[in-house]
From Swiss-Prot:
Classification lineage: Bacteria, Bacillati, Actinomycetota, Actinomycetes, Bifidobacteriales
InterPro entries: ExoRNase_PH_dom1, ExoRNase_PH_dom2_sf, GPSI/PNP, KH_dom, KH_dom_type_1, KH_dom_type_1_sf, NA-bd_OB-fold, PNPase
Gene3D superfamilies on file: GHMP Kinase, N-terminal domain (3.30.230.70), K Homology domain, type 1 (3.30.1370.10), Nucleic acid-binding proteins (2.40.50.140)
Superkingdom of origin: Bacteria
Cofactor(s) demanded: Mg(2+)
Organism field: Bifidobacterium adolescentis (strain ATCC 15703 / DSM 20083 / NCTC 11814 / E194a)
The protein's name: Polyribonucleotide nucleotidyltransferase
Physiological role: Involved in mRNA degradation. Catalyzes the phosphorolysis of single-stranded polyribonucleotides processively in the 3'- to 5'-direction.
Biased composition (Basic and acidic residues): 739-844, 851-877
Residues noted as binding Mg(2+) in the record, renumbered to the chain: D521, D527
Length: 892
């Protein structure tokens, strides 16, 4: 789509040796019905659509400006499908919420605070380069769309992210470049009348690799002077982007609309309240304790309402109450600010640089891995640390940037912390922002994964609030982490700075406050939070109610904050000067390495091996792609056992004959049991050996003695050429695992070389048997209906179920009756002759018939039969043929 309605401007960011970045603003193509719509492009590679829309009617019952900023992360922007059940975007991520705060903070002060029409700014991420962050681009797009929307907006305001890389401040750094950043800073500002840039918002922190870069590679340390230099370095980039937005406004802006403004109070009402309550408020605002001060102020306010009950009768009651409240609050604000500007006198009587009473304590919560309580005045923070396996680190489904987070900092502020009631549940935007700031302050001093292979969750409970709970969270977290045994590279402390500005004797002056109260935050012009070690800054955040603050004032505030930070660090070091012994309830994590090609063996098919190790030892195991294995358990003994098993898999020991093992039965078969000796190594315990566990008695099934999961002591009999391991019961090593087959000689043909059947000599002791020695007929001469069956022999139980006449079978078998057939190998004739038994008894036994469990004495002994049968089943499962032959007694 092309045409004169599409208008665009560009801002070129020159980073010298790091190249140029181009920021382009385009309007007229997309979202044409919004009050203001701008598509912002970074190098024509990342694209964000920003829209600004105002409500048609004001919300008269509101006593604040209703501005809403939303960031819509579209997963298609990164070529992804959402991972949720419904496969669509849901609630905003933490990254989106932090981006909303970065946009809201510099935009809000530039609107009239008496505007009551709803204003909504929506940032839709349409495309993003995985190596770029979108938040600062969205900030500039939001300002541009608001500039052309026709709203009363004192812009433009623009922002830039700078990274200190190899001594140079680089604008709009890529994620890959930020790996070598010592310090990162997001600065938003606007160009004032004298051409200078006034700072409106700062969000900054040391890089995650800052400690290594500073102390191992000698990079620049981000102290107060360096950070102040970063603020100055941001000004040229801010000015270039503001100029591009101003040009876009000239060519594409709508005419500014007229919006009704709602003054908070009338001048007459304010003067009357000042006359009635000034002296009482001046006294009440000198009470140091928060709750008694609030109670006294409430009494004064009720007295003012009673006094004015008969005055200003032309106003409706609801409107009158609202204006009285607004005017009364403004009077408090003026009293507090005037005393600071003219007398350097604060609410609780402190000087401008004084810190409230500090206290620190560790190990106050039982059983948790680490805990601490930090208190500064009436601000009270409980820090709790939890350690776990690296596999518990947070996985982030982000459009770009890091996809996981090992250190997770959660900030929570329940309503009782201020003596109020309210909703308790999911975190609000403010809580997410405070947690992210505290996390940013501590990440640079955390040990590396190799030094401390734990996932760390830190929770800051703001159980008492009267100013700067976020910086109190940094202090409490330092104490808690050290109490949990986390080897921090240095302790970190934080302090909140305030600012009051105004005209005194015709001169505009600024007063910087150290360790501000909640009331000073509400009535002041700035909330400037600074955290760091004794040597450099690790985190920085600035919010202001002014259009902008001179950079030299901020530089002075940084130096003042360092003094306070040093004092707090002394208190922390007195409480705990290093990492404590880890809690007995914390997991002990050890590491080992396995060759990459052995990872599959450690995991096993479908995770069978690793799950078995975890089940047997009680340890938890996590394996990295490079072969690093992390093993954890409470107490450490289970972890050591699991490590030993994993090492055996990675460097297996081949069992040798004579070695004894306590193995677990992993499988049973009809011929024996497979026993696990070492991880991944099994051996066969033959059924003939298993009988020794049953006192040598015959067993019908292996499961009668051993079942899967049983533990049995075995000794290695031998290992064949294929690596197959045969096992034995200790004490029976010399016993063969199967009956040996005797030498049957050269069998010549299927008859075994014993000559013709009719020529064989029969023993005289068999003359009384009903045998027929006449020549057999050829098979073709036999009757076609002969009872001949070459099917596999059925089990006896199957045959008995058949409906046939057993008498016919007996008659065809001659004197064999219904004897159970036995296919065991026959003994040699000499063995049978040596037996001392009565042949008549044998015949009578045949006539009586034999039971299933009877053993025919002319066959091998029971134990040899069992061995032969097991060996035969192991070698072959071919069906056995039974051939039935009948003889004609009348044939010559």
């Amino acid at each position: 789509m092309e045409g004169p309605e599409i208008k665009a401007v560009e801002a070129v960011i020159d980073n010298g040796s790091f190249g140029k970045r181009t920021l382009r603003f385009e309007t007229g193509r997309l979202a044409q019905q919004a009050d203001g719509a701008v598509a912002a492009y970074l190098d024509d590679d990342s694209m964000i659509l920003s829209t600004t829309t105002a409500g048609s009617s004001p919300k008269e019952n509101y006593d604040f400006f209703p501005l809403t900023v939303d960031v819509e992360e579209k997963m298609y922007a990164a070529g992804k499908i959402p991972g949720s059940f419904f496969r669509r975007e849901g609630r905003p991520s933490s990254e989106a919420i932090l981006a909303c705060r970065i946009i809201d903070r510099p935009l809000r002060p530039l609107f009239p605070h008496t505007l009551r029409n709803e204003v909504q700014v929506v940032e839709t991420v349409l495309a993003v380069n995985p190596d770029d962050a979108y938040d600062v681009v969205a900030l500039n797009a939001a300002s541009a769309s608001t500039m052309i929307s026709g709203l009363p907006f004192e812009g433009p305001v623009s922002g830039v992210r700078l990274a200190l890389i190899d001594g140079q401040w680089v604008a709009f750094p890529r994620w890959s470049e930020r790996e070598r950043a010592v310090f990162e800073i997001v600065v938003a500002g606007r160009v004032v009348e004298n051409g200078d840039v006034a700072i409106a918002m700062i969000e900054a922190g040391a890089g995650k690799n800052a400690w290594h870069l500073i102390y191992d590679e000698g990079q620049t340390k981000p102290d107060e002077e360096v950070v102040a230099g970063g603020l100055e370095a941001a000004k040229p980039f801010i000015k270039v982007i503001c100029e591009a937005q101003a040009e876009l406004k000239k060519i594409a802006a709508k005419e500014t609309k007229e919006f009704q403004l709602f003054p908070e109070y009338t001048e007459d009402l304010y003067n009357r309240i000042d006359e009635i309550a000034h002296a009482d408020l001046d006294e009440a605002l000198s009470i140091a304790e928060k709750l008694p001060r609030q109670d006294r102020i409430h009494e004064i306010k009720e007295g003012v309402k009673a006094t004015l009950a008969g005055e200003f009768t032309d106003m409706e009651d609801a409107e009158k109450d609202k204006e009285i409240g607004n005017a009364f609050k403004e009077l408090q604000r003026q009293i507090v600010r005037r005393r600071i500007l003219t007398q350097d006198y604060r609410i609780d009587g402190r000087g401008l640089r004084d810190i409230r009473t500090l206290s620190a304590e560790v190990d106050i919560v039982p059983r948790v891995h680490g805990s601490a309580l930090f208190q500064r005045g009436e601000t009270q923070i409980l820090g709790v640390t939890t350690l776990n396996m690296l596999k518990m680190e947070q996985q982030i489904d982000a459009l770009s940037g890091p996809q996981s987070k090992r250190y997770m900092h959660n900030y929570e502020m329940p309503p009782y912390s201020t003596g109020e009631t309210g909703r308790v549940g999911s975190p609000k935007r403010r809580e997410i922002g405070h947690g992210a700031l505290a996390e940013k302050a501590l990440v640079p001093v955390l040990p590396s994964r190799e030094e401390f292979p734990y996932a760390i969750r830190q929770v800051s409970e703001a159980i008492g609030s009267n100013g700067s709970t976020s910086m109190g969270s940094v202090c409490a977290s330092t104490l808690s982490l050290l109490a949990a045994g986390v080897p921090l590279k240095a302790p970190v402390a934080g302090i909140a700075m305030g600012l009051v500005s105004g005209d005194v004797d015709g001169q505009h002056i600024y007063k910087t406050l150290t360790d501000i109260l909640g009331a000073e935050d509400a009535f002041g012009d700035m909330d400037f939070k600074v955290a760091g070690t004794s040597e450099f800054i690790t985190a920085l955040q600035l919010d202001t109610k002014l259009d902008g603050i001179p950079a030299d004032i901020l530089a002075s505030a940084l130096q003042q904050a360092k003094e306070a930070r040093t004092t707090i660090l002394e208190v922390i070091n007195e409480c705990i000067d290093g990492p404590a012994e880890m809690s007995p309830y914390a997991p002990r994590i050890i590491t080992t390495t396995v060759p990459v090609d052995k990872i599959g063996e450690v995991i096993g098919p479908k995770g069978k091996m690793i799950n078995q190790i975890q089940e047997d030892t009680g340890a938890e195991i996590a394996i990295e792609d490079d072969g690093t294995v992390y093993i954890s358990s409470e107490g450490g003994e289970a972890a050591e056992k699991a490590k030993e098993i994993i090492d055996q898999i990675a460097n297996p020991h081949v069992p040798e004959a004579g070695e004894t093992y306590n193995g677990k039965v992993v499988k049973t078969t009809s011929f024996g049991a497979f026993v696990n000796l070492t991880p991944g190594t099994d051996g066969l315990l033959h059924i003939s050996q298993i009988r020794n566990l049953a006192n040598g008695e015959r067993i019908d099934a292996v499961e009668d003695v051993l079942k899967e999961g049983d533990t049995v002591e075995v000794v290695v009999q031998g290992v064949d050429d294929r690596g197959k391991i045969s096992l034995a019961i200790p004490g029976f090593e010399d016993q063969e695992s199967s009956a040996p087959r005797r030498d049957r000689g050269d069998r010549d043909d299927r008859r075994g070389g014993r000559g013709r059947r009719d020529d064989r000599r029969r023993s005289d002791d068999r003359d009384d048997r009903d045998y027929d020695d006449r020549p057999r007929r050829r098979r073709s001469d036999r009757d076609d209906d002969r009872d001949y069956d070459d099917r596999p022999r059925r089990r006896r139980s199957d045959r008995d179920d058949r409906d046939y006449d057993r008498d016919d079978r007996r008659s065809s078998r001659s004197d064999r009756d219904d004897r159970d057939y036995d296919d065991r190998p026959r003994r040699r004739r000499s063995d049978r002759d040596d037996r001392d038994y009565d042949r008549d008894d044998r015949r009578s036994d045949r006539r009586r018939g034999s039971r299933r469990d009877d053993r025919n004495p002319r066959y091998a002994a029971d134990e040899n039969y069992d061995e032969y049968r097991a060996d035969r089943e192991e070698r072959s499962e071919r069906p056995r043929r039974r051939v039935r032959r009948d003889f004609d007694p009348f044939e010559d």
